[in-house]
């Protein structure tokens, strides 16, 4: 039986570093919010069967998203951290029968709204049938420095280093087990949780355009990228 590909967007964060008067996923770039741009990517992709957004129980912006994308599931069961939000989303997918344990969950940052469709297709094609799952990533290009008290303490060898992106694709059952720990401290992405089980996910070539909206100046670059699409 064909595995379903389910996009899961954790959107319960408040984006403190971005400095806006609302969570950054609800900041407007052009005529749409960042989150609406993200949802459009997955809704347009023929290989994605379902898209789910998990927001905070206190979210007051999600109704607009639901109106714009009535076919998207918007769940207000987000947690205090990204890992908790993803865990809650995966658990509900399994509990409701919307996902089987072998279905693929593609977890994607709500602030990465420039994901090229070809990068998404590449991830699904190369990792969609892999038991260990896989993530989009790009080789580290810049020279890395280790700091101590505001000074360089060492230059880090960047050979073999990759910068993780999203989506990160894993079977629902594996992801559920990986996030089942009571203490999720130190889990910064889904791959790091899966790695703790001894699993080594695949690295799939990502795309430099798939940047994450983090600082206010990132909005300028994102706007240019979206206009170029």
Swiss-Prot record:
Source species taxonomy: Bacteria, Pseudomonadati, Pseudomonadota, Betaproteobacteria, Neisseriales
UniProt-recorded name of the protein: 2-C-methyl-D-erythritol 4-phosphate cytidylyltransferase
GO molecular function: 2-C-methyl-D-erythritol 4-phosphate cytidylyltransferase activity
UniProt keyword annotations, A-Z: Isoprene biosynthesis, Nucleotidyltransferase, Transferase
InterPro entries, alphabetized: IspD, IspD/TarI, IspD/TarI_cytidylyltransf_bact, ISPD_synthase_CS, Nucleotide-diphossugar_trans
Source organism, top-level taxon: Bacteria
Family matches, as CDD domains: CDP-ME_synthetase
Keyword Transmembrane helix: no
GO annotation, biological process: isopentenyl diphosphate biosynthetic process, methylerythritol 4-phosphate pathway
UniProt-listed Pfam families: IspD (PF01128)
Transition state stabilizer, annotated site positions: 17, 24
Biological source species: Neisseria gonorrhoeae (strain ATCC 700825 / FA 1090)
Catalytic reactions of this protein: 2-C-methyl-D-erythritol 4-phosphate + CTP + H(+) = 4-CDP-2-C-methyl-D-erythritol + diphosphate
